[in-house]
């Protein structure tokens, strides 16, 4: 059928590119969306962060006879006024809006009347079918005819009245049927209206075609054979009606195609446009008027030929969800489909592949897929031309269901120069126009009052739209600004993926055509980035290659490069955020190792990887946008190295230079090597059938590790916790070790039977009580608790040491020192536990001492040698330590000073009972509250107070003489004690910074028995402000005890006073000294003075703060510093290692931090580390976060139905409840089907059901158990499939 040709309107329209200066972009993401009332004046709005709304239904490509008309050059003042009122909230004036009208009723669908002279559009809605006429000279749009509400007089003469349902689609006919309008809706019929018969008595209704059994979704007229009408319904049937035949009058379709139970969402005839000057356009197929396409709820795209309707011409799984709309290309053999999965896919329906030249100038964004020519969808091979239909030529990911999309009606020789208009379900009110040559940025965005219900192209420059607020708008695209015009020309931002540098955009903005004047030229696009340093990720973005992008974590490790090209493509549906639209050309999925970070101002971040066909044919011509990045850490390090010559000459560790310059590689290296959880190597439950020999074999490695730590850190083998570690698996050896950790009962009996001890009866009763089982059980529980705590601290120490070595390997000294500080603080904490066992430890390790801890004072015990061990033997640090410092045998640690000293004199156990009574009386003088609590008479209280006030210290010489006597007494006592047990002083021990902190208030000279001078004592007493604070009670007590035992005639009482805050302590101490001096008893005086001072400090210890090297305090401070500085790895390490021990922060912070860290690991493709982190997480609720995030549906291989097996599940559950045997549930599973009572695929080797993990041979698809395949392929070294087919192991 011949058609007249009309010139294009390109020359008649003038393009306005004027812009108003504004600091805001039209597409600002921070602008609110104002709801506008429906009136004649229309104000546009800017797009929001949410994406456009979409509705179901399709539309036929408009008829192009309207191109015959010329656009009038004149316009009225009213239209100019209306255009002038259109102002975006971004303050950029738009001149594209030409028509606007508020419709009187609800609107749902729109189409054009294909009569050039009418200049009308038809709009349908609920109880509304109106004909709207627009006038270009006045810019006016008005309702001229409502086919449902015509002359009432004529309507009263009708014999019948037809009721219409909610209209879902409306279409207008062509040529001889150009006055026909077809509507369909929720009813089962298609109604045909003749607009030329509106004023007749019979009315405009011409016929009703009601052969469908369910609601009809789409109708369409054939452009060539204009009498043919096609309809698609929810009943899964496609019906073709010939309006000329008598079948339509009989309510019968001429052709019915049943697609099964799959509902038809949209159906379209292939268009047959006749464009002017169409000689250069590739001629379409000869059967264009016979072809039509349909898209279904299953996502299936079908094409048919009327001459062979019994079989589909093409079958394409276009979408993973329901397909909602489709549109044929005006001239080429392509179809664009949209679905609920948010994808807009371009499919080549021809019989030959694309021309390679068509890919040469495609504007390509590879910020999503870093290897621009490496994306192949599953099942597609570029080597086989016949399989190219399995992959879409282009994919626009909108993240919202697409319900309306239409090609721009124009003669385009290149498919990627085509423009498509689309709208989607959602709250965003706009119609987006994309050019496939630059689909990551929309060409135009037509903002409306509310979400769009439908649109139609009048010609290539005029588009009409209807929205939910019943507003009809018309847009002149020649005068509408493009998105590129409103985007900022200069942009700088931090790199999202690495966060270590800046990103600049090239100033050449490009255009929307592949070969236009604004398009990028391949010959001139030479990229030289030698002036700026680019990371491996940026280089792979800028220079696409045929090889798949290597995982960035592998690039720095040559040993892993052999696996870099073996990655497979990811799944079909990448997770997309709600506010991001991504575009991928020629790739249905993202490439392995790619990432999504790009975001445009229109929220349509476009990603594109090269077409799968272009990969083989012309990928070297595919270009990506230029992105220049600066690696700031590298630049700063270079500047620093230039200024510090020695730093540049510093030798680096072998292997660290390969990745230490890349922050991303350093992060990945640390994430792999650092230890985050002490539960990683633990076994949750020991098998019941594990024998003692197996247990012994399993514990060998642990014992060796702990023994290695004991040797490495210089721990004494006489400590209690080392005995716990070296506990043997033999019952005899265990008994021996336990006996060694308890106080020797023989020594207790010896003390008990001493003739000089007046309290022998009391100790005898204690010895009897120690045999009671109740006390023995309590001691065992205490020992077990201490053993577990010691073991836990050893694990933490080893992990801190490991993490410190990792940071030292990459020359990160700051973090290395931090981990060493935490390690040494844990060693100090470990020493406190051992000291408590050695001093107060008798009460934990001996049943007798559980009753009376003071018995320690009267016994030498079997642990005297370990009590004499020095602090440096516990916490020697290899880094930052000093040499040449000897250990102090008499030093017992801070906690030991809070209890009465033990075994310091040879006559400590021979203390007369009278002295004990007087000692208890002096104790009552410490606190009036304590005195009253003990119930002493007030007269005794008064006498004691008088004695204390009467004998105040008034002369320093008296104290010097007193201390000389004390030194003589102690020296004699030390001589007697040395005859019994001579401590061995370790030589050349190293001490850590914790030793230096604790021992800073005593001179190293005392380690060799030298005497201090007055000046040295004064310097030590006032060395630091921290050393003078009462919070360090243990160190203060240690200094007081040591000085009281020193042989120094020059010691003054003011040495005991450290600050004003501790004046009361010193005063009480001096009172005690003077009272004992008056009594004149020198022998017990030394012990009594030391005891009272220790008791005084012990009472104040609860209200004092911990020392700065306390593990809990130090780790919390480091955690706060790491959070403030943004040290992610250190923060997460502290949380996972120390949260359960020291309660570093709140549980909410822990959960949020771990969630964000897991997201970061996923972003850097460290999935295995993230899985291990969840697996060994000590919190169950966080562990559950990695489960239940996906649902796998399994279908029966026989009946093709979903495997639910509810009946068998109920059956086995009832049997379990009835019998109480839980193993009954093992018979339940999804390896069989309740519907057909058949089993699924059996193992190809053992022919047993596949109940759990299953392996599959990719070549042939045969499945089997992992054990069977391992035995077949690995043990027996077979390469063929066990079934004997042609499959083989790659």
From Swiss-Prot:
Entry keyword Metal-binding: yes
Entry keywords, A to Z: Metal-binding, Repeat, Vacuole, WD repeat, Zinc, Zinc-finger
GO terms for cellular component: cytosol; GATOR2 complex; vacuolar membrane
Function recorded in the entry: May be involved in a process influencing telomere capping.
GO terms, molecular function: zinc ion binding
SMART domains per UniProt: WD40
PANTHER family the record matches: GATOR COMPLEX PROTEIN WDR24 (PTHR46200:SF1)
Compartments where found: Vacuole
Organism expressing this protein natively: Lachancea thermotolerans (strain ATCC 56472 / CBS 6340 / NRRL Y-8284) (Yeast)
Keyword Metal-binding: yes
Alphabetized InterPro entries for the sequence: WD40/YVTN_repeat-like_dom_sf, WD40_repeat_CS, WD40_repeat_dom_sf, WD40_rpt, WDR24, WDR59_RTC1-like_RING_Znf, Znf_RING
WD repeat feature ranges: 162-203, 211-251, 259-314, 318-357, 397-444, 447-485, 778-819, 821-842, 1079-1119, 1166-1205
Region (Disordered): 1-87, 732-774, 856-924, 960-984, 1004-1034
Zinc finger (RING-type): 1243-1285
GO biological process: positive regulation of macroautophagy; positive regulation of TORC1 signaling
Name of the molecule in the record: Restriction of telomere capping protein 1
Pfam families xref list: WD40 (PF00400), zf-RING_16 (PF17120)
Family statement drawn from the similarity comment of this UniProt entry: Belongs to the WD repeat RTC1 family.
Listed Polar residues bias regions: 1-13, 36-48, 750-770, 858-885, 896-907, 972-981, 1018-1034
